[in-house]
């Protein structure tokens, strides 16, 4: 093992945060220094050249002050027996850089701690503070890290002696292996193996437990029910399926695949052909995938990997739909207990304790969203909507006074995708078809996830919780998706016959499901499974939940073609079996020459005993809200601080919201980029205005008083969130229903039945809505010992509804941004039928009450009519602004609209009744719309025609200025500055950012919100975007070739190719593997573009691993150098491509002064819609644009310009190499956050070389070449956004 020191790992503010944590824990630590340490497992000693090359590889990241370590060492590494994603990707880079003798690289974090006063027990506590025990371990000597590379002989299979010891042997195995088998399932297995006349293996039992867990089989939703002594006619699942039976329109696939599919639009899908790699549009029906998953248990145990693999698993579900599909846009949601932010605790937050094995709500919301965002970011999927709720209280609910809250959290991951019409249904698996696992190797992680997720937290052994934690490697999943893309893009020639993702239960669930669904059996070879940990037993190899894997069937004659695709995409795969005619499953172990699995499929997946559920109905008593002492001003302040209501910027800007170039509506609204969007909208393609929309509905606290109302409101809210998008027929809207409950808790089972019936049998059929997809999680309870007291925390019955719809015209979507300069009217549409119920509202929660009567869907007919009217108003363009009423009631609806419009409001709520608190804070369904005064009569008439006249209330107007005024007639109820309200609303997000990120950055952003004079994004163009300067050259018919270059992990190449294609280029897909193998060269190209993403997951510095793979490969290095020295060539590097090319400066003439691009000052991935100024420079791509100020998509974690010193910066400026700078909304060059999202000096965010032929930019012009893909834009812009000029300049330069 070679040990190599790396660079310092922690910035000053990170060190300071650690010291503060130590102080808070009463640990006397004087100083901490941390640096990376690299460990190389080598097959042969490294010679001088190889060692030098390796040392260069391992020099990466920002330049921080390093010094000789002092103090005691605590070395944090991945747990021995696991392999980190960092290791996988760093090892790939080493191999591509000519270091084949590197068997494996691994990285540790060495803390050198000066703390002479600490006792040994305190050192142990400090070590616990510094690492995540679920993923890491701590050594005290560098040499101990050799344990990371220890090799063990394969463990053998274990037999369970059922024939000798009887049923008791199964009961013992059930406990020892954490199988979570019910008694009737043990009976079933005992009978089955007695009949087979042999003993089961541990792997067979484990496989059975995973395949038949509640998590996988949904036994409760398929059970027979008896409620209050009365047998029920339908199971829960049958009631859900009733929605499809009543409204099957537009649904193409439901209940039978990894995701459901609904009818989409006929558009031009843009992708390269299989032969020449030439990008073009392919006009075809493009249908819409829908999927929403939960990943609750893993997120409670270890939030980052739990949430990351939750998003990753849902993405795989989409990609593995039909015969292969394309994930497109995602959503993420969280329900947790109270945050109790240190120093910012709220009056309603009490600490009720929690089990040691799960983390706090604050830790979940610090790390979980980062994990979910990181996976989506690195995979290349924009995360465009979500929700966040906190609840934790002692309440008098259905079962009397008890603790209700989300110690077991909800982690929701969902999204939309697209699929070809011919691939919606899976194919047929022929006998002899090759059964393949695509993706990463098996590792001893995530064991028992399906069974563990099916238990209440506290029931399983802590070691089993430990074992069920998973690891994420999104860059690997991206490679696998590229393989799937290459396959579906072949159309009828798609080599994939059948595909499933690998999720809960690992291969033990995925492979039986694959062959069984295909009507076949399977014969498998254990030792053909790629395996990074040879010491694993057959059970561990077959059942582990290593992520980023798919299983599929490929015909033998197509295997060579499939192999070539995988090699090009650097995606590992293995043929591990073949399909058989006999419906039998066998797994042979060549190492031990035995057969760990030898089972008829019907034993594994046959008719296991059907669950019978008996339940008793309970009804919460409910007590009217005690309003003594509740003052309106204080109530507003409290409600604006409740996380479900408060600003969620800290959850949003960590996630890429522009990748694909097809995002038409993200969370951020208007020139002030306020996170208040009601729904997410994407374009169906890069050449149309058809699209897809998704929104969420969720009112879980209401279930503490009324189960059915809570479910109905979730459906209603999803609809009101979607209503201001141009959809048309309500039957176009399809729902996902995700049900979370504490099964078996008194009252909850009957409540679940009531809720499902209310939605599946009543409301959805009445509205014409279908629920073709969903998920259930039935173990939402935690138990622990609190001193001498046993405690339980039970989540409310929680239904999260996600609404999906095809969009007729994405340009018509209306946002909450008020237009104060118009002669306008604000109207409330109240669907509460005059009810102002305050039970289980935000107001009740912040005063630690529950209340009695709750909101509800008062009239399904009125809700349907409301949707119809909104669709007419949207289609006609009569709405100026729209926002639904939800958490926080009318007060929050109006406030958020004012925030988005940066304006004042004068609202008269007198007509809503004498009870101002009830009028402002009830959460009945409804919306506020802003219209032109001139259209008022026509719009009112429309409401009358639909029978909604009584729902319509005139409120007042939006006005320029800063005053937020509420009146009852002439009587003033409340007057406050909108800026003050905005500050209150943002404080929760600010405090979370301060804890998690660089507090200096968080403080700067919070200060910027308090500038009432902020003009918002202010655009000034020095050219006309409608002027197509490339048109004369396109007219000549010649399309010069542009090499659209990507490396493994790059994810922004398609929109880049589309932008160049529109400018008149022939865009060619070029993978780095094409250059390494010599299949492709750069000789025939005039233009080279390196695209954005996460090459190699950015593990050796953003873009640095990619660059070094060029620099250390002599032939490829020469090819790049020749290209850059060739006259008349152009090159563009964007984001990751910018980082990569900046590290090729030694090959590029006139690039000697280029800076490095390193970690953002905030030390967080930043996704922003930023204002930049085009500066005077040599850049040929920015000619004619100088002086323009225009918005652009920013998405990076390492974009800060780093120079050697002040003289270096001055030289860059003097040489005229600066091409773009960040400016604030006043047009001034800035280093302030977030206008400058990465802290680059002098606002520098793009540079060029001395000739102007090579331009590097961190922001993404290719993602906003269409106006429709801007988060906000001036109303007068046409189809082409102003950044299209950059690509047309390129075409003009080539003549």
From Swiss-Prot:
CDD domains noted in UniProt: GATase1_FGAR_AT (cd01740), PurL_repeat1 (cd02203)
Function statement: Phosphoribosylformylglycinamidine synthase involved in the purines biosynthetic pathway. Catalyzes the ATP-dependent conversion of formylglycinamide ribonucleotide (FGAR) and glutamine to yield formylglycinamidine ribonucleotide (FGAM) and glutamate.
Superkingdom to which the source organism belongs: Bacteria
Top EC category: ligase
Residues forming the catalytic site: 1135, 1260, 1262
Cellular component aspect of the GO annotation: cytoplasm
Organism of derivation: Sodalis glossinidius (strain morsitans)
Compositionally skewed regions (Basic and acidic residues) per UniProt: 995-1012
GO biological process: 'de novo' IMP biosynthetic process
Protein name: Phosphoribosylformylglycinamidine synthase
Keyword check for Transmembrane helix: no
Record-listed Mg(2+) binding positions: 678, 717, 721, 884
Catalytic reaction list: N(2)-formyl-N(1)-(5-phospho-beta-D-ribosyl)glycinamide + L-glutamine + ATP + H2O = 2-formamido-N(1)-(5-O-phospho-beta-D-ribosyl)acetamidine + L-glutamate + ADP + phosphate + H(+)
């Amino acid at each position: 093992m070679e040990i190599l020191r790396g660079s310092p790992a922690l910035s000053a503010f990170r060190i300071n945060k650690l010291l503060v944590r130590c102080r808070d824990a009463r640990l006397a630590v004087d100083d901490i220094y941390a640096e990376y340490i690299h460990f190389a497992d080598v097959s042969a000693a490294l010679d001088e050249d190889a060692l030098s090359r390796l040392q260069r590889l391992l020099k990466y990241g920002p330049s921080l002050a390093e010094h000789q370590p002092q103090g005691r060492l605590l070395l944090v590494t991945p747990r021995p027996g696991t392999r980190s994603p960092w290791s996988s990707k760093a090892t790939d880079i080493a191999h591509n850089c000519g270091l084949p003798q590197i068997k494996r690289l691994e990285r540790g974090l060495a803390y050198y701690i000066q703390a002479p006063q600490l006792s040994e027990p305190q050192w142990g506590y400090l070590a616990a503070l510094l690492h995540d025990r679920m993923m890491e371990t701590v050594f005290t000597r560098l040499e101990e890290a050799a344990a990371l590379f220890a090799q063990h002989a394969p463990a053998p299979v274990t037999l369970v002696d059922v024939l000798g010891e009887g049923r008791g042997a199964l009961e013992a195995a059930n406990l020892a292996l954490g199988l979570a088998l019910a008694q009737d399932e043990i009976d079933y297995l005992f009978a089955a193996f007695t009949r087979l006349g042999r003993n089961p293996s541990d792997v067979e039992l484990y496989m059975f437990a995973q395949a038949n867990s509640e998590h996988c089989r949904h036994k409760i939703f398929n059970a027979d029910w008896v409620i209050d002594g009365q047998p029920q006619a339908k199971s829960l699942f049958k009631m859900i399926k009733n929605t499809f039976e009543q409204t099957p329109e537009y649904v193409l696939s439901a209940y039978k695949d990894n995701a459901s599919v609904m009818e989409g639009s006929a558009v031009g899908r843009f992708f390269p052909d299989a032969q020449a790699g030439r990008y073009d549009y392919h006009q075809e029906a493009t249908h819409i995938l829908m999927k929403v998953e939960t990943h609750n248990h893993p997120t409670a145990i270890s939030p980052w990997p739990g949430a990351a693999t939750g998003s990753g698993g849902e993405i795989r579900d989409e990609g593995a739909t039909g015969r292969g599909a394309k994930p497109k846009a995602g959503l993420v949601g969280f329900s947790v207990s109270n945050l109790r932010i240190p120093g910012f605790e709220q009056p309603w937050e009490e600490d009720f304790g929690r089990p040691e094995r799960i983390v706090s709500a604050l830790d979940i919301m610090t790390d979980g969203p980062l994990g979910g965002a990181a996976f989506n970011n690195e995979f290349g999927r924009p995360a465009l909507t979500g929700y966040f709720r906190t609840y934790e209280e002692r309440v008098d609910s259905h079962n009397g006074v008890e603790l209700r809250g989300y110690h077991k959290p909800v982690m929701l991951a969902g999204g939309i995708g697209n699929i070809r019409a011919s691939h919606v249904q899976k194919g047929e698996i022929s006998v002899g078809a090759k059964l393949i696992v695509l993706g990463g190797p098996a590792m001893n992680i995530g064991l028992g996830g399906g069974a563990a997720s099916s238990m209440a937290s506290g029931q399983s052994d802590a070691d089993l919780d430990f074992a069920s934690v998973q690891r994420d490697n999104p860059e690997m999943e991206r490679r696998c998706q590229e393989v799937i893309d290459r396959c579906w893009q072949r159309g009828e020639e798609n080599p994939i016959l059948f595909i499933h993702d690998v999720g809960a239960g690992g291969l033990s669930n995925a492979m039986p499901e694959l062959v069984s669904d295909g009507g076949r059996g399977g014969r498998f070879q254990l030792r053909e499974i790629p395996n990074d940990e040879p010491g694993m037993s057959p059970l561990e190899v077959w059942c582990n939940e290593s992520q980023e894997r798919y299983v599929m069937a490929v015909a033998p004659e197509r295997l060579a073609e499939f192999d070539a695709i995988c090699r090009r995409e650097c995606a590992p795969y293995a043929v591990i079996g073949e399909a058989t005619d006999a419906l039998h499953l066998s797994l042979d172990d060549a190492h031990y020459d035995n057969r760990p699995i030898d089972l008829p499929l019907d034993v594994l997946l046959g008719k296991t005993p059907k669950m019978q559920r008996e339940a008793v109905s309970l009804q919460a008593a409910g007590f009217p809200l005690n309003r003594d002492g509740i003052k309106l001003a204080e109530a507003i302040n409290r409600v604006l601080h409740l996380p479900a209501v408060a600003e969620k910027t800290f959850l949003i800007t960590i996630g890429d919201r522009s990748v694909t170039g097809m995002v038409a509506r993200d969370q951020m609204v208007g020139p002030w980029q306020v996170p208040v969007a009601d729904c997410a909208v994407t374009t169906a393609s890069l050449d149309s205005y058809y699209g897809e929309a998704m929104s969420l509905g969720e009112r879980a606290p209401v279930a503490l008083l009324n189960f059915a109302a809570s479910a109905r409101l979730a459906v209603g809210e999803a609809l009101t969130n979607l209503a201001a998008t141009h959809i048309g027929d309500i039957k176009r809207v399809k729902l996902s229903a995700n049900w979370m409950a504490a099964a078996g808790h008194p009252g909850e089972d009957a409540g679940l039945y009531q809720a499902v019936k209310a939605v599946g049998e009543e409301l959805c059929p009445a509205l014409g809505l279908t629920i073709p997809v969903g998920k259930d999680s039935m173990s939402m309870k935690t138990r622990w010992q609190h001193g001498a007291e046993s405690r339980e925390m039970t989540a409310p019955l929680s239904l999260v509804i996600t609404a999906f719809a095809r969009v007729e015209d994405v340009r018509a979507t209306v946002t909450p941004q008020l237009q104060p300069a118009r002669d306008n009217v604000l109207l409330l549409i109240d669907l509460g039928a005059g009810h102002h119920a305050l039970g289980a509202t935000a107001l009740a929660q912040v005063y630690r009450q529950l209340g009695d009567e709750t909101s509800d869907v008062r009239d399904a007919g009125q809700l349907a009519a409301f949707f119809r009217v909104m669709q007419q108003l949207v289609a006609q363009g009569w709405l100026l602004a729209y926002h639904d009423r939800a958490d926080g009631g009318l007060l929050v609806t109006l406030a958020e609209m004012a925030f988005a419009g940066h304006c004042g409001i004068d609202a008269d709520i007198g007509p809503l009744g004498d009870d101002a608190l009830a009028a402002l804070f009830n959460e009945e369904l409804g919306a506020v719309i802003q219209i032109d005064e001139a259209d008022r009569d026509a719009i009112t008439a429309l409401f009358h025609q639909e029978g909604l006249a009584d729902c319509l209330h005139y409120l007042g107007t939006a006005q320029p200025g800063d005053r937020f005024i509420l009146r009852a007639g002439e009587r003033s109820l409340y007057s406050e500055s909108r800026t003050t309200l905005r500050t209150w609303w943002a404080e929760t997000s600010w405090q979370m950012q301060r804890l998690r990120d660089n507090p200096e950055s968080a403080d700067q952003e919070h200060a910027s919100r308090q500038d009432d004079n902020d003009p918002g994004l202010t655009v000034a163009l020095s050219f006309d975007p409608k002027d197509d300067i490339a048109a004369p050259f396109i007219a000549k018919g010649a399309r010069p070739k542009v090499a659209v270059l990507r490396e493994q992990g790059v994810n922004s190449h398609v929109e880049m190719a589309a932008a160049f294609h529109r400018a008149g280029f022939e865009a060619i897909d070029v993978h780095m593997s094409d250059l390494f193998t010599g299949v492709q060269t750069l000789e025939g190209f005039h233009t080279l573009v390196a695209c954005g993403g996460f090459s190699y997951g950015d593990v050796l510095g953003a873009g640095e691993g990619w660059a070094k793979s060029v620099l250390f490969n002599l032939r490829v290095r020469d090819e790049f150098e020749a290209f850059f020295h060739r006259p008349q060539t152009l090159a563009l590097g964007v984001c990751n491509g910018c980082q990569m090319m900046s590290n090729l400066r030694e090959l590029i003439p006139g690039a000697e002064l280029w800076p490095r691009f390193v970690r953002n000052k905030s030390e967080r991935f930043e996704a922003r819609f930023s204002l930049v100024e085009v500066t005077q420079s040599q850049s040929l791509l920015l000619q004619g644009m100088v002086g323009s100020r225009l918005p652009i998509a920013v998405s990076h974690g390492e974009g800060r310009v780093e120079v050697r010193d002040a003289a270096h910066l001055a030289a860059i400026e003097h040489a005229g190499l600066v091409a773009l700078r960040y400016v604030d909304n006043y047009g001034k060059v800035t280093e302030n956050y977030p206008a400058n999202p990465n802290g680059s000096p002098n606002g520098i965010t793009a540079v060029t070389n001395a000739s102007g032929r090579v331009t590097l930019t961190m922001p993404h012009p290719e993602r906003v070449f269409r106006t429709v893909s801007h988060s906000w834009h001036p109303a007068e812009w046409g189809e082409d956004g102003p950044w299209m000029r950059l690509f047309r300049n390129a075409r003009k330069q080539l003549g």
